[in-house]
Amino acid sequence: MLKMNLANLQLFAHKKGGGSTSNGRDSQAKRLGAKAADGQTVSGGSILYRQRGTHIYPGANVGRGGDDTLFAKVEGVVRFERKGRDKKQVSVYPIAK
């Protein structure tokens, strides 16, 4: 009877598998914040402040858009003011002619 020695041959990877990561993404900047400075002259319809929510409230001659953007309703001078103790507002005062 012929007896054979069988070798236990195991093959392993010669390179490690390329793993995956759940990080490595970032969102685009939204360009929020003041678009007009205090004391600046703006025309009607100009965007004054882009925001999420109401960081700053609309004052005189200022409207609020659907995305909470504040815009000038008339041509005039921009003023950032305090509204009470802990709130801020932006107003536009027409230039006297």
Curated annotation (Swiss-Prot):
One Pfam family in the UniProt entry: Ribosomal_L27
Source organism, top-level taxon: Bacteria
GO MF annotation: an example: structural constituent of ribosome
Cleaved propeptide residues: 1-12
Keyword DNA-binding: no
Family: Belongs to the bacterial ribosomal protein bL27 family.
Protein name: Large ribosomal subunit protein bL27
Organism of this sequence: Streptococcus agalactiae serotype III (strain NEM316)
Gene name per UniProt: rpmA
